[in-house]
Amino acid sequence: MTTNAPGAVILAAGKGTRMKSRLPKVLHPIAGKPMLGHVLSAVSALGSERPVLVVGPGMDEVATYARGLVSGLTIAVQEKQLGTGDAVRAAAPHIDKKESVVLVVFGDTPLVRAETLADMTRRCEEGSDIVVLGFEAADPTGYGRLILDGNDVVRIVEHKDASEEERKNKLCFGGPMAVRAAHLPALLAKLTNKNAQGEFYMTDFVAHGRAAGLVCSAVFCLEADMQGVNSRADLAAAEATMQQRLRMAAMAGGVTMLDPSSVYLSMDTEFGEDVTVGQNVVFGPGCVIANGVTIKAFSHLEGAHVAEGAEIGPFARIRPGSEIGRKARIGNFVETKKARIEDGAKVNHLSYIGDARVGAGANIGAGTITCNYDGYNKFFTDIGAGAFIGSNSSLVAPVSIGDGAYLGSGSVVTKDVAADALGVARARQFEKPGWAAAFHAKHKDKKKASGE
């Protein structure tokens, strides 16, 4: 996106106490992906290979997650929560000396776009020494204000330190900042904590830079892109914004959504063209949906691959490891897990198919269960191509049903059934004429004798 990849500092040392959670704030998910992961992905899209993540003491869980996502990442620890400027100071010794531009972003702003960060970096490359990210807020309460002189940023005033006149200004500072690396040491050295909070503010870079004759400018984005997350309510708002982005992108790519606001996607959900998605469908992580698939209302998919022309739902649950073949059919109240449903196979109602293969063109009757777990281990069920499994059958794994075999309804199968054979595993039906009448008469006489 840019000629030269920037250095990057991600600030993630906040304790997130308002989240009321044992999980670190930046690891709370948005669209199935931790907030910090969204930010790291945006930074990585710019080509930054050695970003620095600033965490607080004891935030090993955050550091471990980030290292697993970005191999070249360095961890810096901010020992005390003394403000954003102090956090950048903690990162400074770890910034690669080769970097010409350093981009500072926040781990709790998961909606920031890589394109916006690229614009900031490009502005630095084109002559600005400091570039801040701003937006116009509908309600600017709580935000730092951008004070402009034409196209130049004069200073950033924190809300608590702003005058009444400055608080009327709706141009706000979003948080991210790009700085020419050569100026960073001097800017850090000039920071003081003479403010209402007694903290070292990164926002003071602008005033100090201006005083030193540096060029300070701004790049602007939508307010929604700068939604920060400090509470569960903020998390819900950010989720709603991200979901709307994902829905719009899916529909632009050829997906029909009958009620878009009720469909929930994950960041890695992949769609082909001419996919139709019904109401209240949820896509967990790891779903790949091919061309022409129909997913009906109230279905839940996770870790699933669905091939061209297949039909899912309504009320289907497709769990991780499921592979649904071309023109296969998974109907209402069917659950699959680690199951390969091959081309044209049908599992139409009320079934559990786990640790199994259902061959091409096979038909699974209502109420069929693959009994795959003995309390300690999982076992595999293999159902051949063209097999017919009668309703209300239990297949006790490990077991194999051959190609073209026919299994009688109500069977409890514990042994393999050969190809093209009929398998019936149930008690033989018998009849006792008059038994029911005698039974009822006997019990009625007992009730009468006891006075009931």
Curated annotation (Swiss-Prot):
Keywords: Acyltransferase, Cell shape, Cell wall biogenesis/degradation, Cytoplasm, Magnesium, Metal-binding, Multifunctional enzyme, Nucleotidyltransferase, Peptidoglycan synthesis, Repeat, Transferase. UDP-N-acetyl-alpha-D-glucosamine binds at residues 11-14, 25, 78, 83-84, 144, 158, 230, 319, 337, 352, 363. Binds 1 Mg(2+) ion per subunit. SUPFAM superfamilies: Nucleotide-diphospho-sugar transferases, Trimeric LpxA-like enzymes. Residues 254-452 are annotated as: N-acetyltransferase. Acetyl-CoA binds at A366, N372, Y373, S391, S409, R426. Its main location: cytoplasm. The active site is at H349 (proton acceptor). This is Bifunctional protein GlmU. The lineage of its organism: Bacteria, Pseudomonadati, Pseudomonadota, Alphaproteobacteria, Hyphomicrobiales.
